[in-house]
Each structure stands twice: as C-alpha cells, then as structure tokens.
Amino acid sequence: MKCLHLAATALGLAALAGCVAPVGPVEVTRFHVPELSSLGRGAIAVEPAAGQDGQSLEYRSYAAAIARQLVLLGYSEAPAGTASPQFASLRIERRSFRADRPRSPVSVGVGGSTGSYGSGVGLGIGLDLSGPPPEQVETVLGVTIKHRASGKALWEGKASFAVRAASPLAQTQLGAAKLAEALFGGFPGASGETIQVK
C-alpha cells in the first residue's frame, strides 16, 4: 500500500512538473558608485522613469515588486507625497517576437554504397512538420537609484529574460517578482559585471 502511495505521489509530481514552462536565466547587469555607504538605508520612493505610465497596472505591479526588494535591503518606503532623499527610477520594456529557425524545414540526404554484388544510391527527404517557433515575450526591467537633491545616479541595474508567451511568467505578476529578485540579489553586485541568475 505504501508503495502505491509513493508511486501516486511521484506521478502527481511528474504531472505538475510538466505544467511548469521552462524558463531561461535572467540576465542582470549592475553599475554603482565606489562609495556605497548611502545605499540600503533611509527612505526611498519608486517612481516612473520618463515616458512610463505610472498609473498602469503593469507599472504598479513592477513598482510593488521593486519596493519589496528595497525594503528587504534596508530601505524604508517613503510615505506617498513626500520627497524622499533617494528615489528608484523604474523603466519597463516588453516586446513579443518569434525566434528565427536555424535551419530549413526541408532537408535532403543522398547516400551510396558499392559491394561485391553491385552498387546502389539512396535519396532521403526530411520534412519538419513542427510548425513555426512559439511566440516569445522579452521583458527588460531597469532601475536607477538616484540622490534626489543632486540627481546623481548611485546605483543602476538592468534585468531581462525571455519566455514563451504561453508561460505563466509572461504574465506581469509572476514576471515582476522574478525579475526584481534577480536584479537585487547580492545587492549592490559587482559594478559593470553581467551575470546569469537561474
């Protein structure tokens, strides 16, 4: 009976794993000033970068994910309507695309052989019937932490990943959390280094 229960559990986990879409790593690049003492302390506000719609649901989801990470780093969230000493300028870019096929959908092969009883030539044709590549969604998240009074950039980071359009992570809520965690993991990070976060 115990074996049957374990087998059923294993089958359930396998089925669940099949429902989770594969996700590539998040590419993260960060830059910061040499003096880091002002980072990770005091009040901070998340604000839309120029050209961003700060009232959209997408922006608010990403802003909330960024704010959570900043609080975990030691910042406090500035009350609405107050001018915090630092602010995080947030930019979001999303685009849909289809990857180019690396090869032709039709392939032709020719083979020949010679033996004691004669020779022969064979011709083979292969057709790729898998259809076009699935649509992908790329999301790029950019955050710049600035000193409000001087406008000086103290820290800047960019995180990006691409997933299938049908993946749950193509949706804003899940994608925002994943990108924000990757962007601020190991904060402030090595300046100028690009890393892959799985």
Regions found by a protein language model. Give the residues of each.
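Sec-dependent bacterial lipoprotein signal peptides
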Residues: 1-19
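C-terminal/domain-edge helix-coil "capping" segments
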Residues: 19-36, 130-198
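A structural "domain/chain start" motif
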Residues: 19-73, 100, 192-198
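Envelope-exposed proteins and targeting segments
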Residues: 40-42, 66, 73, 84-88, ...
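Solvent-exposed loop/turn segments at secondary-structure junctions
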Residues: 51-52, 94-97, 161-162
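Structured segments of extracytoplasmic/periplasmic soluble domains
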Residues: 65-76, 95, 182-190
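Acidic helix-start/capping segments at beta-turn-to-alpha-helix junctions
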Residues: 78-99, 198
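Surface-exposed short loop/turn segments
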Residues: 91-150
